[in-house]
């Protein structure tokens, strides 16, 4: 969902950094539109969305996310730091949440776009943390989601790094066929 937010923000480059198959860190960095400080705090509230103003807007949605639940749900079970800046702002902002509690908001130097770090997933819900599968299984899920989003937007560059090692470095592609070749190899794309 973090990648989908980046795509929805108009990013043309999205980087995903994962440590320990996502248990320790999931970080998504983009060069999209970013958020102003008020929206950066508001986005962590349940059902907060900038995509629906009237009921008619539901028929016009062309984005991945619109319900305004993902960031609130993530912030409930992890330590989250969001850095963001819009084009017109000189200084960005940093917002910190843990276990649904708003810990801090402050100004920070950051590039245009959004950088969100999710640390210590399920640290406050030990029973849920126990249900995580092995690192291999959890990382396979990360790769599946990364691939799913990368396939939907071949014109966007995507990078996936795990434990300091680049897994995928996908440059913007001319078409879905070229993106499939980058992800799965030329033999699969021919089929």
Give residue ranges: language-model regions.
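N-terminal phosphate-binding caps/lids of nucleotide- and nucleic-acid-binding domains
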Residues: 1-191
């Amino acid at each position: 969902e973090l990648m989908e937010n980046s795509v929805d923000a108009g990013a043309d480059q999205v980087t995903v950094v994962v440590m320990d198959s996502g248990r320790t860190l999931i970080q998504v960095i983009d060069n999209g539109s970013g958020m102003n400080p008020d929206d950066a705090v508001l986005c962590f509230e349940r059902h907060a969305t900038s995509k629906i103003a009237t009921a008619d807007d539901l028929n016009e949605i062309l984005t991945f996310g619109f319900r305004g639940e993902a960031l609130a749900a993530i912030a409930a079970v992890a330590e989250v730091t969001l850095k963001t800046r819009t084009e017109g702002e000189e200084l960005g902002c940093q917002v910190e949440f843990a276990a649904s509690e708003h810990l801090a908001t402050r100004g920070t130097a950051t590039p245009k776009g959004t950088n969100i770090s999710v640390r210590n997933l399920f640290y406050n819900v030990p029973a849920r943390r126990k249900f995580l599968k092995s690192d291999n299984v959890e990382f396979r899920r990360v790769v599946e989601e990364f691939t799913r989003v990368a396939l939907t937007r071949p014109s966007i560059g995507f990078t996936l790094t795990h434990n300091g090692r680049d897994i995928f470095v996908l440059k913007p592609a001319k078409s879905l066929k070229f993106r499939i070749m980058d992800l799965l190899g030329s033999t699969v794309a021919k089929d």
